[in-house]
Amino acid sequence: MPKESEVINSEFHVDVQDPERLNGHPVAKFINKLSGQPESYVNRTNYIFGRTLGAGSFGVVRQARKLSTNEDVAIKILLKKALQGNNVQLQMLYEELSILQKLSHPNIVSFKDWFESKDKFYIVTQLATGGELFDRILSRGKFTEVDAVEIIVQILGAVEYMHSKNVVHRDLKPENVLYVDKSENSPLVIADFGIAKQLKGEEDLIYKAAGSLGYVAPEVLTQDGHGKPCDIWSIGVITYTLLCGYSPFIAESVEGFMEECTASRYPVTFHMPYWDNISIDVKRFILKALRLNPADRPTATELLDDPWITSKRVETSNILPDVKKGFSLRKKLRDAIEIVKLNNRIKRLRNMYSLGDDGDNDIEENSLNESLLDGVTHSLDDLRLQSQKKGGELTEEQMKLKSALTKDAFVQIVKAATKNKHKVLAGEEEDDSKKTLHDDRESKSED
Protein backbone atom coordinates (compact mmCIF):
# COMPACT_ATOMS: atom_id res chain seq x y z
CA MET A 1 0.00 0.00 0.00
CA PRO A 2 1.59 3.32 -1.04
CA LYS A 3 1.86 6.13 1.46
CA GLU A 4 -0.55 9.07 1.15
CA SER A 5 2.32 11.28 -0.01
CA GLU A 6 3.18 8.80 -2.75
CA VAL A 7 -0.44 8.73 -3.90
CA ILE A 8 -0.53 12.52 -4.16
CA ASN A 9 2.83 12.75 -5.94
CA SER A 10 1.91 10.19 -8.58
CA GLU A 11 -1.66 11.42 -9.00
CA PHE A 12 -0.93 15.12 -9.31
CA HIS A 13 2.51 15.18 -10.91
CA VAL A 14 4.13 17.22 -8.13
CA ASP A 15 7.83 17.33 -8.97
CA VAL A 16 9.43 16.10 -5.75
CA GLN A 17 12.86 16.58 -7.31
CA ASP A 18 12.37 20.35 -7.52
CA PRO A 19 15.51 21.76 -5.82
CA GLU A 20 13.54 24.57 -4.20
CA ARG A 21 11.27 21.98 -2.62
CA LEU A 22 13.77 19.51 -1.20
CA ASN A 23 17.23 21.06 -0.99
CA GLY A 24 16.44 22.61 2.38
CA HIS A 25 18.75 22.92 5.32
CA PRO A 26 20.48 19.51 5.82
CA VAL A 27 19.99 19.69 9.59
CA ALA A 28 16.26 20.26 9.16
CA LYS A 29 16.05 17.34 6.74
CA PHE A 30 17.94 15.11 9.17
CA ILE A 31 15.66 16.09 12.08
CA ASN A 32 12.59 15.47 9.94
CA LYS A 33 13.87 12.03 9.04
CA LEU A 34 14.51 11.16 12.68
CA SER A 35 11.03 12.35 13.68
CA GLY A 36 9.34 10.42 10.91
CA GLN A 37 8.16 13.50 9.01
CA PRO A 38 7.58 13.19 5.24
CA GLU A 39 10.44 14.44 3.07
CA SER A 40 8.42 17.38 1.73
CA TYR A 41 7.91 18.71 5.28
CA VAL A 42 11.27 20.49 5.01
CA ASN A 43 9.43 23.10 2.92
CA ARG A 44 7.56 24.29 6.00
CA THR A 45 10.74 26.02 7.20
CA ASN A 46 10.39 28.34 4.20
CA TYR A 47 7.18 29.87 5.59
CA ILE A 48 6.32 32.14 8.52
CA PHE A 49 2.67 31.73 9.45
CA GLY A 50 0.42 34.72 10.16
CA ARG A 51 -3.23 35.25 11.01
CA THR A 52 -6.04 32.80 10.38
CA LEU A 53 -8.17 33.79 7.39
CA GLY A 54 -10.84 31.10 7.63
CA ALA A 55 -11.74 27.70 9.06
CA GLY A 56 -13.77 24.74 7.85
CA SER A 57 -14.61 21.27 9.08
CA PHE A 58 -11.22 19.81 8.17
CA GLY A 59 -8.74 22.63 8.70
CA VAL A 60 -7.92 26.31 8.48
CA VAL A 61 -6.56 28.84 5.99
CA ARG A 62 -3.72 31.05 7.19
CA GLN A 63 -1.76 33.92 5.76
CA ALA A 64 1.98 33.22 5.51
CA ARG A 65 5.21 34.74 4.22
CA LYS A 66 7.47 32.69 1.95
CA LEU A 67 11.00 33.49 3.12
CA SER A 68 12.85 32.62 -0.09
CA THR A 69 10.80 35.08 -2.18
CA ASN A 70 9.38 37.41 0.51
CA GLU A 71 5.97 36.67 -1.01
CA ASP A 72 2.73 36.64 0.98
CA VAL A 73 0.68 33.50 0.36
CA ALA A 74 -2.39 31.69 1.65
CA ILE A 75 -1.91 28.21 3.12
CA LYS A 76 -4.80 25.79 3.56
CA ILE A 77 -3.95 23.40 6.40
CA LEU A 78 -5.99 20.19 6.50
CA LEU A 79 -5.89 17.73 9.40
CA LYS A 80 -5.28 14.16 8.27
CA LYS A 81 -7.10 12.90 11.36
CA ALA A 82 -10.24 14.76 10.26
CA LEU A 83 -9.97 13.22 6.79
CA GLN A 84 -9.08 9.73 8.02
CA GLY A 85 -11.51 7.12 6.76
CA ASN A 86 -13.36 9.68 4.64
CA ASN A 87 -12.52 8.61 1.11
CA VAL A 88 -14.93 11.13 -0.41
CA GLN A 89 -13.22 14.08 1.27
CA LEU A 90 -9.76 12.74 0.46
CA GLN A 91 -10.76 12.44 -3.19
CA MET A 92 -12.02 16.03 -3.09
CA LEU A 93 -8.67 17.15 -1.69
CA TYR A 94 -6.80 15.32 -4.44
CA GLU A 95 -9.13 16.75 -7.09
CA GLU A 96 -8.70 20.29 -5.76
CA LEU A 97 -4.91 19.90 -5.93
CA SER A 98 -5.11 18.47 -9.43
CA ILE A 99 -7.41 21.22 -10.71
CA LEU A 100 -5.40 24.07 -9.16
CA GLN A 101 -2.21 22.80 -10.79
CA LYS A 102 -3.85 22.62 -14.22
CA LEU A 103 -5.27 26.13 -14.20
CA SER A 104 -3.26 29.23 -15.09
CA HIS A 105 -5.30 32.37 -15.67
CA PRO A 106 -4.96 35.97 -14.41
CA ASN A 107 -8.47 35.82 -12.91
CA ILE A 108 -8.06 32.49 -11.10
CA VAL A 109 -6.16 32.15 -7.83
CA SER A 110 -2.82 30.51 -8.62
CA PHE A 111 -1.37 27.35 -7.11
CA LYS A 112 2.07 27.76 -5.51
CA ASP A 113 3.13 24.64 -3.64
CA TRP A 114 2.07 21.78 -1.41
CA PHE A 115 3.74 19.76 1.34
CA GLU A 116 2.72 17.58 4.25
CA SER A 117 3.57 16.62 7.81
CA LYS A 118 2.67 13.46 9.69
CA ASP A 119 -0.60 15.06 10.75
CA LYS A 120 -1.48 17.64 8.10
CA PHE A 121 -1.61 18.53 4.42
CA TYR A 122 -0.56 22.06 3.35
CA ILE A 123 -1.78 23.67 0.11
CA VAL A 124 -0.10 26.98 -0.78
CA THR A 125 -1.87 29.41 -3.12
CA GLN A 126 -1.76 33.04 -4.17
CA LEU A 127 -2.92 35.43 -1.43
CA ALA A 128 -5.49 37.96 -2.59
CA THR A 129 -5.26 40.95 -0.24
CA GLY A 130 -7.63 43.40 -1.92
CA GLY A 131 -10.78 42.18 -0.20
CA GLU A 132 -14.00 40.53 -1.31
CA LEU A 133 -15.95 41.81 -4.28
CA PHE A 134 -18.83 43.41 -2.37
CA ASP A 135 -16.60 44.88 0.34
CA ARG A 136 -14.71 46.89 -2.27
CA ILE A 137 -17.92 48.12 -3.86
CA LEU A 138 -19.12 49.40 -0.48
CA SER A 139 -15.94 51.47 -0.14
CA ARG A 140 -16.42 53.20 -3.49
CA GLY A 141 -17.77 56.70 -3.93
CA LYS A 142 -19.54 55.73 -7.14
CA PHE A 143 -20.62 52.51 -8.86
CA THR A 144 -22.15 52.29 -12.33
CA GLU A 145 -23.15 49.62 -14.83
CA VAL A 146 -19.85 50.24 -16.58
CA ASP A 147 -18.07 49.17 -13.39
CA ALA A 148 -20.33 46.12 -13.15
CA VAL A 149 -19.50 45.15 -16.74
CA GLU A 150 -15.76 45.27 -15.96
CA ILE A 151 -16.31 42.92 -13.01
CA ILE A 152 -18.51 40.44 -14.87
CA VAL A 153 -16.13 40.36 -17.85
CA GLN A 154 -13.31 39.19 -15.57
CA ILE A 155 -15.50 36.51 -13.98
CA LEU A 156 -16.73 35.35 -17.39
CA GLY A 157 -13.17 35.23 -18.72
CA ALA A 158 -12.10 32.98 -15.86
CA VAL A 159 -15.15 30.73 -16.26
CA GLU A 160 -14.67 30.53 -20.04
CA TYR A 161 -11.09 29.36 -19.41
CA MET A 162 -12.15 26.85 -16.73
CA HIS A 163 -14.85 25.41 -18.94
CA SER A 164 -12.38 25.06 -21.82
CA LYS A 165 -10.45 22.78 -19.46
CA ASN A 166 -13.69 20.93 -18.57
CA VAL A 167 -13.53 22.25 -15.00
CA VAL A 168 -16.74 23.28 -13.24
CA HIS A 169 -16.33 25.50 -10.16
CA ARG A 170 -19.81 24.84 -8.67
CA ASP A 171 -19.48 27.43 -5.90
CA LEU A 172 -19.32 30.81 -7.61
CA LYS A 173 -20.52 33.50 -5.22
CA PRO A 174 -19.36 36.99 -4.18
CA GLU A 175 -17.36 35.64 -1.22
CA ASN A 176 -15.22 33.62 -3.64
CA VAL A 177 -14.45 36.58 -5.91
CA LEU A 178 -11.48 38.50 -4.52
CA TYR A 179 -9.34 41.48 -5.50
CA VAL A 180 -5.64 40.65 -5.85
CA ASP A 181 -4.53 43.85 -4.10
CA LYS A 182 -5.86 47.17 -2.83
CA SER A 183 -4.95 49.20 -5.90
CA GLU A 184 -7.79 50.91 -7.76
CA ASN A 185 -7.24 48.85 -10.91
CA SER A 186 -6.60 45.53 -9.15
CA PRO A 187 -7.74 42.46 -11.08
CA LEU A 188 -10.18 39.96 -9.60
CA VAL A 189 -9.51 36.28 -8.97
CA ILE A 190 -11.89 33.38 -8.41
CA ALA A 191 -10.95 31.37 -5.33
CA ASP A 192 -12.00 28.25 -3.39
CA PHE A 193 -11.97 25.23 -5.66
CA GLY A 194 -12.91 22.91 -2.79
CA ILE A 195 -15.92 21.43 -4.58
CA ALA A 196 -14.82 22.01 -8.18
CA LYS A 197 -15.05 19.02 -10.50
CA GLN A 198 -13.00 17.88 -13.45
CA LEU A 199 -15.42 16.61 -16.09
CA LYS A 200 -14.42 13.61 -18.16
CA GLY A 201 -15.76 15.17 -21.32
CA GLU A 202 -17.63 18.12 -22.78
CA GLU A 203 -21.08 16.67 -21.99
CA ASP A 204 -20.18 14.93 -18.72
CA LEU A 205 -22.63 15.46 -15.84
CA ILE A 206 -22.40 15.37 -12.04
CA TYR A 207 -25.26 13.87 -10.04
CA LYS A 208 -24.47 14.76 -6.42
CA ALA A 209 -25.59 18.09 -4.98
CA ALA A 210 -23.05 20.64 -3.76
CA GLY A 211 -22.95 24.42 -3.67
CA SER A 212 -24.29 27.42 -1.75
CA LEU A 213 -28.03 27.92 -1.44
CA GLY A 214 -28.97 31.18 -3.12
CA TYR A 215 -26.32 30.82 -5.83
CA VAL A 216 -26.63 27.14 -6.73
CA ALA A 217 -28.55 26.22 -9.90
CA PRO A 218 -31.88 24.34 -9.66
CA GLU A 219 -30.62 21.29 -11.55
CA VAL A 220 -27.95 20.80 -8.89
CA LEU A 221 -30.63 20.47 -6.20
CA THR A 222 -32.86 18.15 -8.21
CA GLN A 223 -29.83 15.91 -8.86
CA ASP A 224 -30.90 15.37 -12.45
CA GLY A 225 -27.33 15.97 -13.56
CA HIS A 226 -25.42 19.24 -13.82
CA GLY A 227 -22.37 20.51 -15.63
CA LYS A 228 -20.94 23.77 -16.92
CA PRO A 229 -24.31 25.61 -17.11
CA CYS A 230 -24.54 25.59 -13.30
CA ASP A 231 -21.69 28.14 -13.21
CA ILE A 232 -23.60 30.34 -15.67
CA TRP A 233 -26.61 30.38 -13.32
CA SER A 234 -24.36 31.52 -10.47
CA ILE A 235 -23.00 34.35 -12.63
CA GLY A 236 -26.58 35.45 -13.25
CA VAL A 237 -27.26 35.63 -9.51
CA ILE A 238 -24.00 37.50 -8.87
CA THR A 239 -24.85 40.03 -11.61
CA TYR A 240 -28.33 40.60 -10.17
CA THR A 241 -26.99 41.13 -6.65
CA LEU A 242 -24.18 43.34 -7.93
CA LEU A 243 -26.63 45.82 -9.43
CA CYS A 244 -29.17 46.14 -6.62
CA GLY A 245 -27.46 44.98 -3.41
CA TYR A 246 -29.84 42.14 -2.55
CA SER A 247 -30.24 38.54 -3.64
CA PRO A 248 -33.03 37.62 -6.06
CA PHE A 249 -33.93 34.66 -3.83
CA ILE A 250 -35.14 34.92 -0.22
CA ALA A 251 -36.04 31.26 0.43
CA GLU A 252 -34.30 29.59 3.36
CA SER A 253 -34.86 26.01 2.21
CA VAL A 254 -34.33 23.95 -0.92
CA GLU A 255 -38.08 23.51 -1.32
CA GLY A 256 -38.70 27.24 -0.98
CA PHE A 257 -35.97 28.05 -3.48
CA MET A 258 -37.38 25.65 -6.07
CA GLU A 259 -40.83 27.18 -5.60
CA GLU A 260 -39.41 30.67 -6.10
CA CYS A 261 -37.73 29.64 -9.34
CA THR A 262 -40.87 28.14 -10.86
CA ALA A 263 -43.70 30.29 -9.44
CA SER A 264 -43.64 32.84 -12.28
CA ARG A 265 -42.63 33.07 -15.91
CA TYR A 266 -39.17 34.21 -14.87
CA PRO A 267 -37.23 32.99 -11.81
CA VAL A 268 -36.42 36.57 -10.68
CA THR A 269 -38.23 39.89 -10.33
CA PHE A 270 -36.75 43.33 -10.97
CA HIS A 271 -38.32 45.35 -8.15
CA MET A 272 -39.11 49.04 -8.32
CA PRO A 273 -37.54 51.47 -7.56
CA TYR A 274 -34.23 49.59 -7.28
CA TRP A 275 -34.17 48.63 -10.96
CA ASP A 276 -35.64 51.84 -12.40
CA ASN A 277 -32.25 53.18 -13.49
CA ILE A 278 -30.86 49.86 -14.69
CA SER A 279 -30.67 49.20 -18.43
CA ILE A 280 -32.88 46.68 -20.21
CA ASP A 281 -29.73 45.03 -21.60
CA VAL A 282 -28.50 43.88 -18.20
CA LYS A 283 -31.95 42.56 -17.30
CA ARG A 284 -31.93 40.48 -20.47
CA PHE A 285 -28.39 39.33 -19.68
CA ILE A 286 -29.50 38.13 -16.23
CA LEU A 287 -32.59 36.34 -17.56
CA LYS A 288 -30.47 34.50 -20.15
CA ALA A 289 -28.09 33.27 -17.45
CA LEU A 290 -31.01 32.26 -15.21
CA ARG A 291 -32.92 30.13 -17.71
CA LEU A 292 -34.35 27.15 -15.84
CA ASN A 293 -33.34 24.64 -18.49
CA PRO A 294 -29.53 24.42 -18.34
CA ALA A 295 -29.42 23.47 -22.02
CA ASP A 296 -30.96 26.86 -22.86
CA ARG A 297 -28.36 28.91 -21.01
CA PRO A 298 -25.63 30.60 -23.04
CA THR A 299 -22.00 29.64 -22.57
CA ALA A 300 -19.48 31.98 -20.97
CA THR A 301 -18.13 32.71 -24.45
CA GLU A 302 -21.59 33.67 -25.70
CA LEU A 303 -22.21 35.91 -22.69
CA LEU A 304 -18.95 37.73 -23.37
CA ASP A 305 -20.51 38.69 -26.71
CA ASP A 306 -23.82 39.78 -25.13
CA PRO A 307 -25.04 43.32 -25.97
CA TRP A 308 -24.79 44.38 -22.32
CA ILE A 309 -21.07 43.50 -22.37
CA THR A 310 -20.25 44.88 -25.81
CA SER A 311 -22.67 47.82 -26.09
CA LYS A 312 -21.52 51.40 -25.65
CA ARG A 313 -25.02 52.28 -24.42
CA VAL A 314 -24.50 50.99 -20.87
CA GLU A 315 -25.99 53.26 -18.19
CA THR A 316 -23.46 55.47 -16.40
CA SER A 317 -25.68 56.79 -13.60
CA ASN A 318 -24.50 56.15 -10.04
CA ILE A 319 -26.40 53.17 -8.57
CA LEU A 320 -24.27 52.92 -5.42
CA PRO A 321 -26.84 54.40 -2.97
CA ASP A 322 -29.40 51.68 -3.74
CA VAL A 323 -26.74 48.98 -3.82
CA LYS A 324 -25.40 50.01 -0.41
CA LYS A 325 -28.82 49.58 1.20
CA GLY A 326 -28.64 45.87 0.54
CA PHE A 327 -24.92 45.38 1.06
CA SER A 328 -24.41 47.17 4.37
CA LEU A 329 -26.56 45.06 6.70
CA ARG A 330 -25.50 41.91 4.88
CA LYS A 331 -21.85 42.73 5.54
CA LYS A 332 -22.35 43.50 9.25
CA LEU A 333 -24.28 40.31 9.88
CA ARG A 334 -21.98 38.07 7.88
CA ASP A 335 -18.77 39.49 9.37
CA ALA A 336 -19.95 38.98 12.94
CA ILE A 337 -21.25 35.45 12.50
CA GLU A 338 -18.22 34.37 10.51
CA ILE A 339 -15.89 35.42 13.34
CA VAL A 340 -17.99 33.51 15.88
CA LYS A 341 -18.15 30.42 13.65
CA LEU A 342 -14.46 30.70 12.80
CA ASN A 343 -13.38 30.58 16.43
CA ASN A 344 -15.76 27.72 17.24
CA ARG A 345 -14.44 25.65 14.35
CA ILE A 346 -10.86 26.40 15.33
CA LYS A 347 -11.57 25.18 18.88
CA ARG A 348 -12.92 21.89 17.54
CA LEU A 349 -9.93 21.52 15.23
CA ARG A 350 -7.48 22.32 18.04
CA ASN A 351 -9.00 19.57 20.18
CA MET A 352 -8.44 17.11 17.36
CA TYR A 353 -5.03 18.57 16.52
CA SER A 354 -3.81 18.24 20.13
CA LEU A 355 -3.78 14.47 19.70
CA GLY A 356 -1.26 14.68 16.85
CA ASP A 357 2.50 14.32 16.80
CA ASP A 358 3.57 17.52 15.04
CA GLY A 359 5.35 20.07 17.17
CA ASP A 360 4.22 23.09 15.16
CA ASN A 361 1.27 25.27 16.12
CA ASP A 362 -0.66 25.95 12.91
CA ILE A 363 -4.10 26.53 14.37
CA GLU A 364 -4.81 29.69 16.36
CA GLU A 365 -7.91 31.66 17.29
CA ASN A 366 -8.74 35.16 16.09
CA SER A 367 -10.18 37.86 18.33
CA LEU A 368 -13.80 38.93 17.98
CA ASN A 369 -14.40 42.64 17.58
CA GLU A 370 -16.84 43.59 20.36
CA SER A 371 -17.92 46.82 18.67
CA LEU A 372 -18.79 44.84 15.55
CA LEU A 373 -21.09 42.58 17.53
CA ASP A 374 -22.66 45.61 19.27
CA GLY A 375 -23.49 47.16 15.91
CA VAL A 376 -24.99 43.95 14.60
CA THR A 377 -27.05 43.45 17.77
CA HIS A 378 -28.52 46.94 17.41
CA SER A 379 -29.30 46.36 13.73
CA LEU A 380 -31.07 43.13 14.56
CA ASP A 381 -32.97 44.73 17.44
CA ASP A 382 -34.20 47.45 15.07
CA LEU A 383 -35.20 44.85 12.50
CA ARG A 384 -37.01 42.78 15.12
CA LEU A 385 -38.86 45.77 16.65
CA GLN A 386 -39.98 47.06 13.26
CA SER A 387 -41.18 43.58 12.38
CA GLN A 388 -43.20 43.34 15.60
CA LYS A 389 -44.86 46.69 14.91
CA LYS A 390 -46.12 45.35 11.61
CA GLY A 391 -47.75 42.26 13.07
CA GLY A 392 -44.74 39.99 12.95
CA GLU A 393 -44.07 40.29 9.22
CA LEU A 394 -41.02 41.86 7.62
CA THR A 395 -41.53 44.74 5.23
CA GLU A 396 -40.51 44.32 1.60
CA GLU A 397 -37.37 46.36 2.32
CA GLN A 398 -36.43 44.15 5.27
CA MET A 399 -37.05 41.00 3.24
CA LYS A 400 -34.58 42.28 0.65
CA LEU A 401 -31.99 42.84 3.36
CA LYS A 402 -32.60 39.40 4.78
CA SER A 403 -32.36 37.86 1.32
CA ALA A 404 -28.75 39.02 1.13
CA LEU A 405 -27.86 36.46 3.80
CA THR A 406 -27.53 32.72 3.56
CA LYS A 407 -29.90 30.68 5.70
CA ASP A 408 -27.20 29.56 8.09
CA ALA A 409 -25.68 33.00 8.62
CA PHE A 410 -29.03 34.65 9.31
CA VAL A 411 -30.24 31.96 11.72
CA GLN A 412 -26.96 31.79 13.60
CA ILE A 413 -26.38 35.53 13.98
CA VAL A 414 -29.91 36.05 15.32
CA LYS A 415 -29.19 33.38 17.92
CA ALA A 416 -25.81 34.88 18.75
CA ALA A 417 -27.04 38.44 19.03
CA THR A 418 -29.96 37.56 21.29
CA LYS A 419 -27.82 35.55 23.72
CA ASN A 420 -25.71 37.12 26.42
CA LYS A 421 -23.07 39.11 24.55
CA HIS A 422 -20.24 37.94 26.78
CA LYS A 423 -21.07 34.31 26.08
CA VAL A 424 -20.86 35.03 22.38
CA LEU A 425 -17.54 36.81 22.83
CA ALA A 426 -16.27 33.79 24.74
CA GLY A 427 -16.96 31.66 21.68
CA GLU A 428 -19.91 29.63 22.92
CA GLU A 429 -20.60 26.65 20.67
CA GLU A 430 -23.14 27.49 17.99
CA ASP A 431 -26.11 25.31 17.13
CA ASP A 432 -25.25 23.48 13.93
CA SER A 433 -28.59 21.69 13.70
CA LYS A 434 -29.63 23.84 10.74
CA LYS A 435 -27.23 24.06 7.84
CA THR A 436 -27.18 25.36 4.32
CA LEU A 437 -26.58 23.01 1.45
CA HIS A 438 -22.94 24.07 1.53
CA ASP A 439 -21.39 24.45 4.99
CA ASP A 440 -17.70 24.17 4.17
CA ARG A 441 -16.93 20.52 3.41
CA GLU A 442 -19.23 18.72 5.86
CA SER A 443 -22.23 18.65 3.56
CA LYS A 444 -20.41 18.28 0.26
CA SER A 445 -21.33 15.00 -1.36
CA GLU A 446 -19.43 13.76 -4.34
CA ASP A 447 -19.27 10.85 -6.73
From Swiss-Prot:
One of its GO terms (biological process) is signal transduction. The keyword Nucleotide-binding applies. The keyword Iron does not apply. CDD domains: STKc_CAMK. InterPro entries: Kinase-like_dom_sf, Prot_kinase_dom, Protein_kinase_ATP_BS, Ser/Thr_kinase_AS. The modification Phosphoserine is found at residues 354, 367, 371, 387, 443. Its EC number is 2.7.11.17. SUPFAM superfamilies: Protein kinase-like (PK-like). Pfam families: Pkinase. Residues 432-447 have a biased composition (Basic and acidic residues). It is an enzyme of class 2 (transferase). Present with 7500 molecules/cell in log phase SD medium. Important in cellular regulation. This is Calcium/calmodulin-dependent protein kinase II. The gene is CMK2.
